[in-house]
């Protein structure tokens, strides 16, 4: 369901005043069993999230949104397996292998929902 985790998006980060404040707020609201995922759009935000590891407040998953392949590799290097990394944005059949080879743990494919072909179904009541 949509109630078993917290996803911190870019607008949440902006409203809270930055990654640190947004993650701290989410952690304060989340129970110890609730996962927290953070979307970041640059290596600077990734570094802000990684800085919370020492306090035990870092997100469980960090979504690297629309990162280049080089930045994905660098994110994997900086994270060094301490947090699950998800790649998102620009994923399709032509890019998925190269994205997987960067070393991220998870790849999300938005095209499965926003670009899926429409099936025309009709129903006749009898």
Residue ranges and their predicted role:
Residues 3, 13, 91-92, 112, ...:
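Gly/Ser/Thr-rich beta-alpha loop segments that engage phosphate groups in nucleotides
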Residues 1-71:
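Glycine- and Gly-Pro-enriched alpha-helical subdomains that act as flexible
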Residues 98-126:
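Flexible C-terminal active-site loop/helix
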Residues 4-6, 65, 89, 110, ...:
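Flexible, active-site-adjacent loop/turn segments at secondary-structure boundaries
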Residues 42-57, 67-80, 85-87, 91-109:
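Catalytic cores of alpha/beta
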């Amino acid at each position: 369901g949509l109630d078993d985790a917290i996803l911190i998006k870019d607008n949440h980060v902006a409203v809270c005043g930055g990654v640190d404040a947004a993650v701290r707020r989410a952690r304060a609201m989340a129970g110890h069993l609730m996962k927290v995922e953070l979307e970041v759009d640059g290596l600077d935000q990734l570094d802000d999230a990684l800085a919370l590891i020492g306090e035990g407040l870092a997100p469980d998953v960090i979504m690297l949104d629309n990162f280049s392949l080089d930045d994905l590799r660098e994110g994997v290097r900086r994270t060094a397996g301490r947090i699950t990394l998800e790649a998102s944005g620009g994923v399709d059949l032509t890019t998925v292998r190269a994205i997987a080879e960067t070393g991220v743990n998870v790849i999300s494919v938005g095209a499965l929902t926003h670009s899926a072909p429409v099936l025309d179904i009709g129903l006749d009541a009898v």
